[in-house]
Amino acid sequence: MSDQPDLFGTPTGAKAPHAIMPAGLPASWKEALAEEFAAPYFHALKDFLVEERRTHTVYPPAADVFNALRYTPLENVKVMILGQDPYHGPGQAHGLSFSVRPGVRIPPSLKNIYKELQSDIPGFTPPRHGYLKAWAEQGVLLLNAVLTVRAGEANSHAGKGWESFTDAVIRAVNNRPQRVVFVLWGAYARKKARLITAPHHVIIESAHPSPLSVTRFMGTRPFSRVNAALEEAGEAPIDWQLPAQVEE
């Protein structure tokens, strides 16, 4: 088993017969996902993405694909917010669902998330950025079901193998003995509820914060409900307030 810092970025020659491990993953994720990294579908996914990056622009950059797992070790996961696939505009995606890099315009769905936070969490002040790393560092796993996308083509990497991998991530989180709150927004994410079987976990579902469904999202108060569920289980709540100034 070897770390590969340019995994899914540049070809590495013949297909390896063993696990291919992205660089910088916490030990807990390496252990929990070892079978996935060795699975034939994962090697096929790597081959697909190497060719995609050779012929097209792919987001996020190869070094950022697994940031959700890097920033939030399995043993620290308290909340999971599941997205569908990365933003497909230039410079937006950096491996965390709903988040964008500092200096990038805040996308409409995230603007709506901030609006709901304002009404749900007393004192929340929307920052002028969309960089959600501070949540990830508190144990909020910001996971997309599909971790890459071709530039300008939403859902273009669906059905290529990512879903098998991220389902394994969800199952690993489901196996945690401590309570985890799963936040599932929209029909796509809500289908993943079937993977969440442990009775001590909590699922919070609603419409997606996209402008297309925002009227059914607003007023659902997911953030205070997350904290109430955590505190009920003796866990510290999430500080949803994001820093005013950030840098990568």
Swiss-Prot record:
GO terms for cellular component: cytoplasm. The keyword Ion transport does not apply. One of its GO terms (biological process) is base-excision repair, AP site formation via deaminated base removal. It comes from the Bacteria. It is an enzyme of class 3 (hydrolase). The active site is at 85 (proton acceptor). It catalyses: Hydrolyzes single-stranded DNA or mismatched double-stranded DNA and polynucleotides, releasing free uracil. GO terms for molecular function: uracil DNA N-glycosylase activity. The keyword Cell division does not apply. Keywords: Cytoplasm, DNA damage, DNA repair, Hydrolase. Its main location: cytoplasm. It is found in: Cytoplasm. Gene3D superfamilies: Uracil-DNA glycosylase-like domain. Its EC number is 3.2.2.27. Excises uracil residues from the DNA which can arise as a result of misincorporation of dUMP residues by DNA polymerase or due to deamination of cytosine. PANTHER family: URACIL-DNA GLYCOSYLASE. NCBIfam families: PRK05254.1-1, PRK05254.1-2, PRK05254.1-4, PRK05254.1-5, ung. HAMAP family: UDG. Belongs to the uracil-DNA glycosylase (UDG) superfamily. UNG family. This is Uracil-DNA glycosylase. The gene is ung.
